[in-house]
């Protein structure tokens, strides 16, 4: 009876051993694969990799012959078969339909389509068997065990640990993530010993000027991705040039790969094999190093479009190591799925037959923040001011963009197509792009002159009639003209009182009080209350039903009545992605109202201090946005604006959680005792710079101090002052953060936040920047330009001194 009980166990053991043995067996002559059914791939012994047919983008009618990571849900492809295109040097991916067969027979491996036509073979004979190795390498071997062909020797866009690229080989990026055709970039191990990265003209394959090189001509040997995860280029004398510098994680715990991605960046990725063993790592591919660090800056060719397509610009998301291509205002992608094709205007091109006045009425020059197209110049002027630079472009039908450099008083005009576009925090020039003017907007170049010409036309017409008519008619005409002149002068005076001239963009719209009362439903829904008044939600009665936020200024100081229009003009001239846009205003009787775009996601105060902490990447995005908005206010707009009351309540979030600063430009309008109850300073407790309490001048550094507090709050997801914390040392965040930084325990600030812990180096950088912003002495604080550079990782950050170290010396 016992032997009967033991029999099933023995059978299971034999079955297990048989399957294990089969996993190690060679792929023998006569074996075959088909795209559909269970026999569609050959698996490596560990099942980490597979070779066979993979549906292209989930499309069951088209299959790729490939090698992929078999244990990862998205089956990440690391190699795919390619064949020459009509006898040309360039290659195309091998994609077949169901019914095709891959067969190892007669000493060769051959892929045939449903009609029996051969579509691919690796051009080797006398093959005895094949192997799919645990390294991800698919090999064909002779009967003697010698390698006849291997996928590692014919790379596509990816290399794996233990893979070596010898002289004359190259990686080709894909065209798109799901289009395996040769893309726009190559990484070549040249026969002259140099490792070079090139932009590639699609579809011709012409190589533009390189954007990175190892500079090892006559010395380089091979590109190595070794078994420990290091990637380096070997030199003939035995030395090595590191290609990536990432700290390598355990090969046992992570899958590794390095890919020349579709954006031209060579990235080294890791993926946790066991998410339970590595709980802090996301279950996805994470880039641990990139080359080059900034593709937008690296590519700049006289021929070709640059990193992105023509008329677009390139931007880097440092938090995710990703590259994006964007279209400027009033432009859209030619093909949304193939953004490398560039952008086109979504308006009619300027007609060269237009006279200057008509051109200025139909077109405007809109500023673009931190974007530049360094090439495409066709005209230069010097010396010149910005207004004239604008005029010269808007009246020139060939001009698409004008660039003005204030320091040198120089203007450049650029024409289509715009190339090498890039977004960069260090763009020192004002970039203006031509866009259509809305039909109801007055000219940016003083509407007065065109109105004067219009008046002159009617005066001339009137004079002609006057001399050619009877006395009675002349008398009536004179009466009408005198009355018209009186009305015109009266109207012009009213216009001058209610709307100052605007020379830098579309002016804010003038609303009547009744319009805003109707839009807000009688000022019913309160969005917030601040020092300058109450903010109400409203909706315009336009074709879009535009949601708005209406600020009713209730405590305007008497001497600021005349300043109101000047300040509105200043605010109305600010155009930036990270500033809440002023749509219009009301200056009727004693009523002073400002109309802003509505921010659907509310304030940073609500967003940050809720029960659920926002993701680290989103907090980073907000921090960078606020920094760039302040940089614009301090250094880039026509008239410097010091906010004086930076705090989370004055930072709003739009539909995409883009941070936008509100309430800027209002400091001059408010009595000093209205910006903070019971104090003689402007600002809010906890965010106020020390110099407010001293008899020294107030500069933009007060905003830098406030930003330092906000930055720490963003890092830690808590308020600066929390009286209910268990540890008394943590009550004031600025003090606690300084203590943690000095002790090397930054991790305590983000305890329980796995995403932040994973990015602890960036957390440390942000805390260091915040501590520099919080220096007691204003001159020790960085400018917002330096702050943005430090946050972006563009400059080294020296160790910040203790923020309170100056207190004793100032006492």
Curated annotation (Swiss-Prot):
CDD domains: PAN_AP_plant
Keywords, sorted A to Z: ATP-binding, Disulfide bond, EGF-like domain, Glycoprotein, Kinase, Lectin, Membrane, Nucleotide-binding, Plant defense, Receptor, Serine/threonine-protein kinase, Signal, Transferase, Transmembrane, Transmembrane helix
Gene3D superfamilies: 2.90.10.30, Bulb-type lectin domain, Phosphorylase Kinase, domain 1, Transferase(Phosphotransferase) domain 1
GO cellular component labels: membrane
InterPro entries for the chain: Bulb-type_lectin_dom (IPR001480), Bulb-type_lectin_dom_sf (IPR036426), G-type_lectin_kinases/EP1-like (IPR051343), Kinase-like_dom_sf (IPR011009), Prot_kinase_dom (IPR000719), Protein_kinase_ATP_BS (IPR017441), Ser/Thr_kinase_AS (IPR008271), SRK-like_kinase (IPR024171)
Signal peptide range in chain numbering: 1-23
Subcellular location field: Membrane
Domain Bulb-type lectin: 24-153
SUPFAM superfamilies: alpha-D-mannose-specific plant lectins (SSF51110), Protein kinase-like (PK-like) (SSF56112)
Residue ranges, Extracellular side: 24-464
Domain (PAN) ranges: 352-430
Family matches, as PROSITE patterns: BULB_LECTIN (PS50927), PROTEIN_KINASE_ATP (PS00107), PROTEIN_KINASE_DOM (PS50011), PROTEIN_KINASE_ST (PS00108)
Enzyme class, first EC level, given as a word: transferase
Pfam families (UniProt xref): Pkinase
EC number of this enzyme: 2.7.11.1
Topological category with respect to the lipid bilayer: Single-pass type I membrane protein
Glycosylation sites (chain numbering): 26, 39, 59, 219, 226, 237, 242, 321
Transmembrane segments: 465-485
Cystine bridges: 296-314, 308-325, 327-343, 389-411, 393-399
Domain EGF-like: 292-344
Job description of the protein: Involved in resistance against the herbivorous insect brown planthopper (N.lugens, BPH). Member of the BPH3 (BPH resistance locus 3) cluster which contains LECRK1, LECRK2 and LECRK3.
Name of protein: G-type lectin S-receptor-like serine/threonine-protein kinase LECRK3
């Amino acid at each position: 009876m016992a032997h009967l009980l033991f029999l099933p166990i023995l059978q299971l053991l034999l079955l297990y051993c048989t399957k294990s043995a089969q996993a190690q067996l060679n792929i023998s002559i006569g074996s075959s694969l088909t795209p559909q059914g269970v026999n569609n791939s050959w698996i490596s012994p560990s099942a980490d990799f597979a070779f066979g047919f993979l549906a292209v983008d989930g499309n069951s009618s088209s299959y790729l012959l490939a090698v992929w990571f078999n244990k990862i849900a998205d089956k990440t492809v690391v190699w795919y078969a390619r064949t020459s295109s009509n006898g040309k040097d360039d290659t195309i991916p091998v994609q077949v339909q169901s019914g095709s067969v891959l067969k190892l027979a007669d000493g060769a491996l051959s892929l045939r389509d449903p009609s029996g036509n051969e579509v691919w073979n690796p051009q080797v004979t006398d093959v005895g068997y094949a192997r799919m190795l645990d390294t991800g390498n698919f090999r064909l071997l002779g009967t003697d065990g010698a390698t006849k062909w291997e996928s590692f020797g014919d790379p596509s866009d990816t290399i794996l640990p233990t893979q070596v690229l010898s002289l004359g080989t190259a990686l080709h990026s894909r065209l798109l993530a799901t289009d395996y055709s040769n893309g726009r970039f190559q990484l070549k191990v040249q026969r002259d010993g140099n490792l070079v990265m090139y932009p590639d003209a699609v579809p011709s394959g012409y190589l533009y000027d390189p954007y990175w090189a190892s500079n090892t001509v006559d010395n380089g040997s091979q590109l190595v991705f070794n078994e420990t995860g290091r990637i380096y280029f070997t030199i003939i004398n035995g030395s090595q040039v590191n290609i990536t510098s990432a700290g390598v994680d355990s090969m046992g715990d992570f899958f590794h790969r390095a890919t020349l991605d579709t954006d031209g960046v060579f990235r080294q990725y890791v993926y946790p094999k066991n998410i339970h063993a590595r709980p802090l790592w996301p279950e996805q591919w994470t880039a641990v190093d990139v080359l080059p660090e900034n593709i937008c800056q690296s590519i700049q060719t006289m021929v070709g479009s640059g990193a992105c397509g023509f008329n677009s610009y390139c931007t880097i998301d440092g938090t995710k190591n990703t590259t994006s291509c964007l279209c400027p205002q009033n432009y859209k992608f030619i093909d949304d799925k193939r953004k490398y094709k560039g952008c086109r205007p979504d308006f009619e091109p300027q007609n060269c037959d237009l006279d200057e006045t008509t051109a200025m009425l139909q077109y405007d020059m809109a500023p673009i923040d931190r974007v530049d197209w360094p090439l495409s110049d066709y005209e230069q002027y010097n010396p010149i001011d910005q207004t004239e630079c604008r005029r010269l472009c808007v009246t020139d039908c060939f001009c698409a963009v004008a660039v003005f450099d204030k320091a040198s008083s120089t203007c450049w005009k650029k024409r289509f197509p715009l190339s090498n576009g890039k977004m960069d925090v260090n763009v020192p020039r004002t970039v203006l792009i031509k866009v259509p003017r809305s039909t109801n907007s007055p000219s940016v170049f003083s509407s007065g002159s065109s109105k004067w010409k219009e008046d002159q036309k009617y005066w001339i017409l009137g004079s002609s009639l006057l001399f050619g008519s009877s006395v009675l008619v002349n008398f009536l005409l004179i009466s009408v003209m005198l009355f018209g002149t009186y009305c015109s002068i009266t109207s012009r005076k009213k216009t001058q009182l209610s709307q100052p001239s605007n020379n830098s963009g579309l002016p804010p719209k003038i609303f009547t009080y009744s319009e805003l009362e109707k839009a807000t439903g009688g000022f019913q829904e309160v969005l917030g209350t601040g020092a300058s008044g109450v903010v109400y939600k409203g909706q315009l009665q336009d074709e879009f039903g535009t949601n708005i936020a209406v600020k009713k200024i209730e405590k305007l100081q008497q001497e600021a009545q005349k300043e109101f229009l000047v300040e509105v003009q200043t605010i109305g001239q600010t155009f930036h992605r990270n500033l809440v846009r002023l749509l219009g205003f009301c200056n009727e009787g004693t009523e002073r109202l400002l109309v802003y775009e509505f921010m659907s996601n509310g304030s940073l105060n609500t967003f940050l201090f809720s029960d659920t902490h926002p993701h680290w990447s989103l907090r980073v995005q907000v921090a960078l946005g606020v920094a760039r908005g302040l940089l614009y206010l301090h250094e880039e707009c026509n008239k410097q604006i010091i906010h004086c009351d930076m705090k989370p309540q004055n930072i709003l979030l739009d539909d995409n959680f883009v941070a936008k600063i509100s309430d800027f430009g209002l400091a001059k309008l408010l009595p000093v005792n209205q910006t903070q109850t019971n104090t003689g300073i402007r600002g809010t407790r906890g965010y106020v710079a020390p110099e407010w309490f001293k008899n020294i001048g107030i500069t933009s550094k007060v905003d830098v101090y406030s930003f330092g507090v906000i930055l720490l709050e963003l890092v830690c997801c808590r308020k600066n002052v929390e009286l209910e914390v268990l540890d008394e040392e943590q009550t004031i965040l600025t003090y606690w953060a300084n203590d943690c930084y000095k002790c090397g325990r930054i991790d305590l600030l983000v305890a329980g936040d796995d995403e932040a812990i994973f990015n602890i180096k960036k957390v440390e950088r942000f805390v260091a920047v915040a501590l520099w912003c919080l220096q007691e002495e204003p001159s020790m604080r960085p400018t917002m330009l330096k702050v943005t550079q430090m946050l972006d990782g563009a400059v080294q950050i020296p160790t910040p001194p203790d923020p309170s170290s100056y207190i004793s010396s100032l006492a």
